[in-house]
UniProtKB/Swiss-Prot annotation:
One of its GO terms (molecular function) is ubiquitin protein ligase activity. It comes from Mus musculus. PROSITE patterns: HECT (PS50237), IQ (PS50096). The modification Phosphoserine is found at S421. This is Ubiquitin-protein ligase E3B. The active site is at C1038 (glycyl thioester intermediate). Its EC number is 2.3.2.26.
Amino acid sequence: MFTVSQTSRAWFIDRARQAREERLVQKERERSAVTIQALVRSFLCRRRLHRDIRKEIDEFFSADESGSSKRSALCIFKIARRLLFICKTTEDSERLEKLCRSILNSMDAENEPKVWYVSLALSKDLTLLWIKQIKSILWHCCELLGQLKPEILQDSRLITLYLTMLVTFTDTSTWKILRGKGESLRPALNHICANIMGHLNQRGLYSVLQVLLTRGLARPRPCLSKGMLTAAFSLALRPVVAAQFSDNLMRPFIIHVMSVPALVAHLSTVAPERLGVLESHDMLRKFIVFLRDRDRCRDACESLEGCHTLCLMGNLLHLGSLSLRLLEEEMDGFVSALTQMLCYCQKYVAQKKSNLTHWHPVLGWFSQPVDYGLNDSMYLITKQLQFLWAVPLIRILFSDILSRKLLEHAEPAPVQPQPSSPQTVLPVKSLLKRAFQKSASVRNILRPVGGRRVDSAEVRKVCNICVLYQTSLTTLTQIRLQILTGLTYLDDLLPKLWAFICELGPHGGLKLFLECLNNDTGESKQLLAMLMLFCDCSRHLITILDDIEVYEEQISFKLEELVTISSFLNSFVFKMIWDGIVENAKGETLELFQSVHGWLMVLYERDCRRRFAPEDHWLRRDLKPGVLFQELDKDRRRAQLVLQHIPHVVPHKNRVLLFRNMVIKEKEKLGLVETSSASPHVTHITIRRSRMLEDGYEQLRQLSQHAMKGVIRVKFVNDLGVDEAGIDQDGVFKEFLEEIIKRVFDPALNLFKTTSGDERLYPSPTSYIHENYLQLFEFVGKMLGKAVYEGIVVDVPFASFFLSQMLGHHHSVFYSSVDELPSLDSEFYKNLTSIKRYDGDIADLGLTLSYDEDVMGQLVCHELVPGGKTIPVTDENKISYIHLMAHFRMHTQIKNQTAALISGFRSIIKPEWIRMFSTPELQRLISGDNAEIDLEDLKKHTVYYGGFHGSHRVIIWLWDILASDFTPEERAMFLKFVTSCSRPPLLGFAYLKPPFSIRCVEVSDDQDTGDTLGSVLRGFFTIRKREPGGRLPTSSTCFNLLKLPNYSKKSVLREKLRYAISMNTGFELS
């Protein structure tokens, strides 16, 4: 019974709980239903009300359009209130348009005060309501201006309408109510206008105008009419003028308006009178004063970011170009503002692509977001930026430099009269063309004389200007060449800047700048920026000048000045390296080194091609080669950097010794040197004399790099298939190598051609006719590398431009194909450079950007650029044509052949080993010294066989004939007769392998069996079997061996030897 009672009670409680919850849910449903019904009724009521109001408004404007009498201002006011009550910008834009037109029509009414919409502002009851209403209407206009697209015709009409509304009600000048007696109301109404303008500014008027102007102007063809542009710019200027140019309004004007892409350029062409307004308000001066403050300038740049900061710079520069006199007065502030803006952009300029960078057409890789909408304006922006390096601005900024005189203690240099040119000078058509014109000024030889205080106002001013241009070079990376070309436009700027540099400090430029390297002060950085600018500009100028302009016309720099400059640079770079400054250099220090070193190497390479500096000019006498080698052995970084960057400061002979030591060390490391405990691996090859090139190619091309560097033994097989007698102890391989090189470099094979004139070798453009021609070139490279590796000199004279490519010079950004062109074809070079100096119109010559070549009887047209055969050569592109043509002839035509040969050569010779040599020095490394043969050195290192000795009469006669009777050319022929190379080894005959040898022979070569006891004794005691007067001297070039009969008379020896070397009867193997 107790259990049943408990169960019933629980069931009853649960039932009551469920009923209570259901009642609560029902009440919530009813409450929600009421709320929803109220919302729906409210929505439907509002929709009916809005529909009724819109209907009323539509009827109002329909009646207005039907041509009935003009509506009163009060009617417009009331209908405007109703419209503003329900206005949605997207839905009611057409009604808002009609309202604006009605308001503007009312303002145009003549002598009808009740019609003028503005008259309501004078009603005490309506003044505040009217002001509130016009503010609302005008802001709706602003919102629509931010959405409309000016390139669409209908939108452009609406833009004109809304701009007219804004212009009309932010200034009282067009209000007819103020005519006559109403003039007394102007102050009050001006106050109202100022209030309206202040409200719009707070809501974001400047942002709206920026969007409108950018949309209308940042495109290939601007789509804002003169009226639109004038209205928008007037609106932007009004608040600033009204606030008397306060900083609070100058800031948004600069940030939102002056940063519109190429705004000033468009104003100058579309609405030039607006620029007159800017000038009347002295706005440029006010911009400069505002931006020269570091904090305000940084704030503006951070608000704009890099892309729009460039736009602001462009507009300021354009304004400056129109007000040069003002710039003279405000130069310091102008330079400071531009430098700060460039420095801000520079922080985000990246050296290479990454996930965090974006491409900018002027700044390059940029780590801030890039507004690609500006790309269409970039041409005009760049044109505006060009005012920075245009001649008028350069003349103003560098006026102190250009007008200055050298200090009294600078000694004048004698001036050599230059022959006058019969050609008349044409008008300058471009900056680049002007860089080639001859300077008429007479200057002094410049020496580091010192005497100008570095803390003087003049020096600080020049330093600030140099910092500006140097910052522009490192920031505007994609138009760097344009900047350099502009800065080198004036012939006398760089020489006078160099004179200024020489006069800095108490002892002259070098000591001062070396001290600056160790001082991390602002003054030191500015001085070093001046040096960097000078180096960058001078390097650019010398790179684009040809030899005639450098050596004969001596444009900008006299040769004596180049000697002085190169001496300064050589010392400066060496000190930077040797004092450890370069080892850990980064940032500005690294840029300084690259700048100074780049200018130094351009001068050095120019001197290597055609000397202007005295002998041993490039050597550093305070650098002892022994000390350098010791530091290299200890792996000291500074010694390695000297060889990497300025190897020319070390005497050539020492560098050759270093090269040979590098080879020896590698051989030891690879186990290629005979030791007491091990012998190197030997590769044996068998070569048929009749197919020497083919067999050598087949057997050696597959060898590994290690095997090619190792010992290779050659066994020759004669035409009958019989092995030739003799053991190869490097001599036979030397003959094989020389014979291979002789055959592959024979122009008749068409792997190589010779240049016109001096007949130097380079890859043949038509060598592709050979099967597997690229593999052949790689094999040739390996053979040439093997010869250099083993110290075997081969008589292979290469064209200078080809040697430059072997050294990798053509990869340098300062490499000029035109400079190397004379080494390929001097006549072709003269013809090309004559185009640069052509008096008439280049287009009359009928040239195109193409090159026609006769290839095996067929005329082939090579386009220098895509579509080049249809692009005529004009005065504007003739410089490009010259460089393209030179690059095609020396690089494009033989690119694959050159790459294959260099690949083979570098598989034997490491690139870093030969980078310490110049182009002529590399030729000497390959072919031996071009100095006259040192007979005493040769005599000292000669080995005698067959009874000959140093006091033997035949040997005495031989040396006397070589010294007294033979000409230098005949001595070279004699050396080639014995060694197969007409030049002595670079380090002297002590390094000739095998050593130079002379052996007494009594029989012909086919009967010669070598030295026997009898033959040696007969030779020693001058005993002859028979008179050898009818026999000629012979040689075994593979052993550097001269076989000399035991002649009885000196005259016979002289006659036979001269005949033998002229017939070149060498290449015989005993």
